[in-house]
Structures are given as C-alpha cells and as structure tokens.
Amino acid sequence: MKDRLAELQELSRSYDQQFPDGDNDFDAPREDIVFETDNILESLYRVIQDIQDENQLLLIDVRRLGRQNVRFLTSMRRLSSIKRDTNSIAKAIKTRGEGIHQKLRSMKELSEQAEARHGAHSAVARISHAQYSALARAFQQAMYEYNQAEMKQRDNCKIRIQRQLEIMGKDMSGEQIEDMFEQGKWDVFSENLLADLKGARAALNEIESRHRELLRLEGRIRDVHELFLQMAVLVEKQEDTLNVIELNVQKTLDYTGEAKAQVRKAVQYKKKNPCRTICCFCCPCVN
C-alpha cells in the first residue's frame, strides 16, 4: 500500500489556510455579552446570599437555645446565669427572625417586579421565584425547630412540677396542672405545707421555680406568635409550586452536567483527530 501521509498533511495545511477560523472555535477569545438583566441578577444574588447567611445564623441560635434548655433542666448550679443566657438567645432569635421575614418580603417584591418587566418565563423571574421558595422553606424549618425547642422545654417543666407534687403527696394529672397554670392558682400548694417538712418545702420551691420558667416560656412564645402567623402565610403561598420547582431545578442540574460532559468529549475528539474529516474525503483515493 502506498504511503499517503505526506498528501494528508498537505491537505490538512490547505484546509487550515482555506478555513482559518473553523478549527479554533474553542480556543478563540470571546467577548462577554452584557445583558440587561445582569445587574438585576447581581442584586438578586446579594439578597439571596444575605438571607442564606441569616437563616444559617438563625438555625445556630435555635440549637443553642435547645442546649441551654437542657442545661436548665439538668444543672443544679448557676441557674440564674443559664436563664439570662436563654432569654438573651430567645430575644436574638426573635429579632433575627423578624429581619429575615422582612428581607423575604422584599425579595418577593423584587421577584414580582422582574416577572412584570421581563416575563414569567425569563431567567431572572424563574431564578428569583425558585430561590424565594427555597429560602422561605429554610426559614420555616428554622422557626419550626425553635417552636419545638420551646414546647419541649414547656413539657419538661410540667413534668418536673408533677414529680415535685408527688413528693408533697399531691397526685395531679397533666391536664390539672395545665388548668392551674392557666388560672394561676399556685398558692394552694402552700396551704397545708408544714414548717418541719423540709422535703415538702424544697419541692414547693422547685414548683415555684418551674412555674416562673413556664411564665417566661409563655412570654417568649407570645413574642414570636405574630411572626409564626406571617411565616405560615408566607410559606402557604409557595406550597403548590414548591415540588415542581425542585423537580425542574434537579432536571436542570442533570441536563447541565450531561451537556458539559458532551462538550468535553467533543473538544478532546477534535484535538486528537484533526485529520479525521479529511480522511473521510480521501476514502475514494485509497481505492
């Protein structure tokens, strides 16, 4: 068989001279195209990042509060210090939660403006809507954990009160304790308390301490009650579309990954086989 390598190399050089820009599409420098929505997306990204950071800090505070509540129930010393720390964390959670809620409302307005200006199917509208739903759900989850921590602390206090009542010889159910808590009739425990019964007196002191803790818990829960209502309305509006958004985001990630893989294969194929196209045209010559 005749060696035709020299001819193929000559044809390759001729082809490069005839189409100088055809083989360098991947390596040629490109100018970035500035779209009208770029500034909006940058502003939106900053808002999203800010809310994400605040949600993370809120979740950290909520879990700190849970640990403080456990310390309050198990520790026998420094109770006043633990109470101060717990109240301080609860106030920080309330303030941060209100700030996140306000930022979510602003983001919602920004999303609606983008949709009205660029259309519901534009990239900026879809991105803002999807991110808003995800951030609102994260905020809801953090506040749900906060509510669970406070309710658990409340139940634990009631259990401790019930145990101390048993020490005093008073057998009461959880419902009876709840009724007495709501009515504020705690003085009935001291009516038959004898001065020489130190155990009963200590039990009464423990009951009064847990009662005060319950009052503080009720106050903290009342403080964030309005925030919980606003959050419920905020998230309820997103429930119908949330699953669809998550599915579309996942599909987009899958398609993007597949497209990147195909592009890499194409680039490698072109670099390794510069003469393959020419060889196809030269097949009749082999015969």
UniProtKB/Swiss-Prot annotation:
Q: Which compartments is it annotated to reside in?
A: Membrane; Golgi apparatus, trans-Golgi network membrane
What are the alphabetically sorted keywords of the record? Coiled coil, Golgi apparatus, Membrane, Protein transport, Transport
Asked if the Swiss-Prot or TrEMBL record annotates the protein with the keyword Protein transport, the reply is yes
Q: Which domain of life is it from?
A: Eukaryota
**t-SNARE coiled-coil homology domain segment(s):** 204-266
Name the Pfam families on file: Syntaxin
List the molecular function annotations (GO) for this entry.
Answer: SNAP receptor activity
Among SUPFAM superfamilies, the record links this protein to:
t-snare proteins
Q: Does the keyword Membrane apply?
A: yes
Question: GO CC: one term?
Answer: phagocytic vesicle
Q: Which InterPro entries did the record assign?
A: SNARE (IPR010989), Syntaxin (IPR045242), Syntaxin/epimorphin_CS (IPR006012), Syntaxin11_SNARE (IPR042781), Syntaxin_N (IPR006011), T_SNARE_dom (IPR000727)
Family of this protein = Belongs to the syntaxin family.
Protein name in UniProt = Syntaxin-11
